[in-house]
Amino acid sequence: MSGDYQLRCPTCGLRITDRYSSFCPAGHPGLLVTDYPERTLSLSGQPGIFRYESWLPVRGRLPFTGGTVTYQSDGLAEELGLAHLFIGFNGYWPERGADLVTCSFKELEAVPSMLRATERTAGILVVASAGNTARAFCQVSALTGIPVVIVVPQSALPRLWTTEPAPAALVIGVDGDYADAIAYSTALAAVDPRLIVEGGARNVARRDGMGTVMLDGAVTIGRIPDHYVQAVGSGTGGVAAYEAASRLIRDGRFGGRLPILHLAQNLPFVPMVAAWEEHTRDLQVGPGTPYTEEAEQWVSAPVLTNRTPPYGVPGGTYDALEATGGEMYAISNGLARAAGTLFTDCEGIDLDPAAAVATASLIQAIEMGTIEPGSRVLLNITGGGYDRVVEDHTLVPTPAGYRVPAGNPDDEIRRDVITWVNDHA
């Protein structure tokens, strides 16, 4: 528990008390960073993510035992010729002790985010998602009764389910893509002052929750890995890994070198890969570029599409790649499918499509020589175990309360949402 932490602006260094803050009071656009009073990582006796609660921006706990399970690979490591491949598995795989029942590392974001919101505000979070994040927030709401408003593209609605009913989750499906869902959620939050924009990449609880993947990896390996591999849509997971590794360096017990970030996107929607190849902060997305809404429809991992990622902002993905000497990879659907099959054959568990993209990028990095056979590698499997979870749990669909066009909420939606807030605040 970290009741005395502060938030720091990466541009001006100003430190502030957290009031569910997302921006520097001086107006700087960078991502706020959490400064914890505990310089060394203290491991609690709690299971899952709360093992690392000393570096989470929360005071209390929720009834939640899931977290990353890191183990040293035998099968995939031998197949790829790696001596020290460690897999950070985030999903459902009880035989390995993995208990993220929505089969995604997004639960690592949802748990501290909802706890931080209850501790720092009296409001209700409004969360925009491409699918996996929404499912995770609905699951936490189902377990705790904490109300939440979820806004997703209508195409993501089939991916919304929980293992318990979630009556305190209001789901709105937008006729559009993830960017449309983000815009609608922002407009919706303005309807009532008790509604709070969750913040996405600007939410330090999300980043520090994701950062526990790096913490668990370093604790398991005994040091910071040489390489960190993940598929990204917003790039926030890479930023989280970089921030967590920076804290481990200040700790002093896990080595003094940052891991090289290897971040992958799914062809044909790879705007961050293109920008990084040009070594520019400027992201080219939308009409007149290859990275349009139409391109988003062709990827095998829709959660990896984001037209407004925090790529070029101070403290964002560009800076994390720059600081670590990182690499980016553009992975086709075919390569991702083949890599996912290889992983399942070698390790014995099914993968989320995004995790298959990450596995394919690991293979590509080895072939390119950017990852050496003798180095210590942490592969973040951001989701998996969908086939396994249905053996133990009945999945409860989370229906949409409303299906709406993209744009601003109309008067009827505004009235209904205010009524819903009155009933749940």
Swiss-Prot record:
Annotated TM spans: none
Residues that coordinate or bind pyridoxal 5'-phosphate: 132, 382
Pathway: Cofactor biosynthesis; coenzyme M biosynthesis
EC number from the UniProt entry: 2.5.1.76
N6-(pyridoxal phosphate)lysine: residues carrying this PTM: 106
Molecular function GO terms recorded: cysteate synthase activity; pyridoxal phosphate binding
One Gene Ontology term from the biological process aspect of the record: coenzyme M biosynthetic process
Top-level class of the enzyme under EC nomenclature: transferase
Subunit structure, interactors included: Homotrimer.
Function (record text): Specifically catalyzes the beta-elimination of phosphate from L-phosphoserine and the beta-addition of sulfite to the dehydroalanine intermediate to produce L-cysteate.
Protein name stated in the entry: Cysteate synthase
Source organism of this protein record: Methanosphaerula palustris (strain ATCC BAA-1556 / DSM 19958 / E1-9c)
Lineage: Archaea, Methanobacteriati, Methanobacteriota, Stenosarchaea group, Methanomicrobia
